[in-house]
């Protein structure tokens, strides 16, 4: 009997021959088939997975590196096994032979391409309600969104359909679904992970990211992706200095989210963490100047460049015409036909607002001698599928996209690393995540801090799949 657990624990069991790789894969396949209603996957190849598992067992390699571990790759990432459709009809036949850099590193270490994760169409959205491929459902409550755009990966990891996964994060798309699904999501410093072989949104902001059961799994996968052994940084909570920029990040939270944040802060304070309540000057102003101007201007340009250079048999205009999700089509067509964001606005975002946003973060960390910043990943918990444009938040109707990405957006625009950790359940049993952000290129230390916080919180809740 195989009990599914984390990647690190699974590798240990495989090395100790507690079960074979084939037995592990059979257990995972059965679980995936039983949970097909979550619509987490666009493509699987169980025959190939079984064959590969048998070969690994025959050669006695199970548990060495990542050998035997199936991962879910978001459908905009080339794996060499599945089509890199980015969840849009126009790319349904796009199947690159060469895996993306981030996939190549993991597959070379022995990981198996377990599934292609369903996603928000072309990554431009946070609900994963894809009108072309169907909505991904949250394993905690199938009537709710899992977050996005890497919703399929997060749902698969939370439901233990796959042991871990790789998504992409432009402004929220790894950390938000991780938070709404009760798992760990890591967005590295921009440039830490390779971005080749990935259908893009905004090259300035895009990065692959890891979704996993726990922080040790993230540390393991991060080291493999970066091509170096994980750095053994042991961090004691006592003496850590963590910033609380309350005016922006703690404003207008759902009551359950606010309570969870207060509880976690008290737990860590009892561990002698020093909290510094101070705001980042002009954060909202600088972030607003970067966020949408950069993403909206770069989206059609980067997508067209990718299609022209890496996709055969279909043109950019054909891909655009085939888009099914109204929210994605409206944004893309508005930029293409009406020049929603002008070149001058884009240049202002890149040359003025983004450097000032980055400088504001740098000065904030330095002035207060901070190790990290702590805040709720999202101001609210998962909401019903279908509320793509507006959602009720604290009694008022608000823009769905803007409220869900509000807290995770600024550090994305600054290119900083962020780690979302599951910390609590709401009164109606939905996961709540807290994020820690670090300064640029502090990824290893941020992960070490996350590990220490994870151990202090000891979140053990899992969804029950029907």
UniProtKB/Swiss-Prot annotation:
The active site is at residues 74, 149, 173. GO terms for molecular function: hydrolase activity. Its EC number is 3.5.1.-. GO terms for biological process: auxin biosynthetic process. Keywords: Auxin biosynthesis, Hydrolase, Plasmid. The keyword Hydrolase applies. Pathway: Plant hormone metabolism; auxin biosynthesis. Pfam families: Amidase (PF01425). InterPro entries: Amidase, Amidase_CS, Amidase_dom, AS_sf. PANTHER family: GLUTAMYL-TRNA(GLN) AMIDOTRANSFERASE SUBUNIT A (PTHR11895:SF151), TRANSAMIDASE (PTHR11895). Hydrolyzes indole-3-acetamide (IAM) into indole-3-acetic acid (IAA). Belongs to the amidase family. This is Indoleacetamide hydrolase. It comes from Rhizobium rhizogenes.
């Amino acid at each position: 009997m195989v009990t599914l657990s984390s990647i690190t624990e699974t590798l240990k069991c495989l090395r100790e021959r507690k079960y074979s790789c084939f037995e592990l894969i059979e257990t995972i396949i059965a679980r995936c088939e039983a949970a097909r209603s979550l619509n987490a996957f666009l493509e699987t190849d169980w025959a190939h997975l079984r064959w590969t598992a048998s070969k690994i067992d025959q050669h006695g390699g199970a548990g060495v590196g990542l050998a035997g571990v199936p991962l879910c790759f978001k459908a905009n990432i080339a794996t060499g096994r599945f089509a890199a459709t980015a969840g849009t009809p126009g790319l349904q036949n796009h199947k690159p032979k060469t895996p993306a850099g981030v996939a190549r590193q993991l597959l070379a270490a022995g990981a198996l391409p377990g599934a292609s994760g369903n996603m928000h169409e072309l990554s431009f959205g946070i609900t994963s309600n894809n009108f072309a491929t169907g909505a991904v459902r949250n394993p905690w409550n199938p009537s709710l969104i899992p977050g996005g755009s890497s919703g399929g990966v997060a749902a698969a990891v939370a439901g233990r359909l796959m042991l871990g996964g790789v998504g992409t994060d432009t402004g929220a798309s790894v950390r938000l679904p991780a938070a709404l699904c009760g798992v760990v999501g890591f967005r590295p410093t921009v440039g830490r992970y390779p971005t080749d072989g990935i259908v893009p949104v905004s090259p300035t902001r895009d990065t692959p990211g890891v979704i996993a059961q726990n922080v040790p799994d993230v540390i393991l996968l991060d080291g493999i992706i970066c091509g170096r052994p994980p750095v053994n940084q042991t961090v004691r909570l006592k003496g850590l200095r963590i910033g609380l920029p309350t005016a922006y990040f703690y404003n207008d939270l759902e009551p359950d989210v606010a309570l969870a944040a207060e509880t976690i802060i008290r737990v860590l304070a009892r561990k002698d963490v020093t909290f510094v309540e101070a705001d980042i000057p002009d954060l909202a102003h600088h972030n607003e100047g970067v966020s949408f101007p950069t993403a909206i201007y770069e989206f059609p340009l980067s997508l067209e460049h990718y299609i022209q250079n890496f996709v055969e048999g279909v043109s950019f205009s054909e891909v655009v015409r085939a888009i099914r999700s109204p929210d994605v089509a409206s944004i893309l067509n508005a930029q293409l036909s009406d020049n929603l964001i002008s070149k001058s606005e884009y240049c202002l975002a890149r040359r003025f607002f983004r450097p000032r946003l980055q400088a504001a973060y740098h000065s904030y960390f330095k002035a207060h001698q901070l190790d990290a910043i702590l805040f709720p990943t999202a101001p609210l918990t998962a909401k019903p599928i279908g509320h793509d444009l507006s959602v009720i938040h604290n009694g008022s109707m608000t823009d769905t996209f803007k409220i869900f990405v509000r807290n995770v957006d600024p550090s994305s625009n600054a290119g900083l690393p962020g780690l979302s950790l599951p910390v609590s359940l709401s009164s109606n049993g939905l996961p709540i995540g807290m994020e820690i952000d670090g300064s640029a290129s502090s990824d290893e230390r941020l992960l070490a801090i996350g590990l220490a916080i994870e151990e202090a919180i000891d979140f053990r809740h899992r969804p029950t799949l029907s």
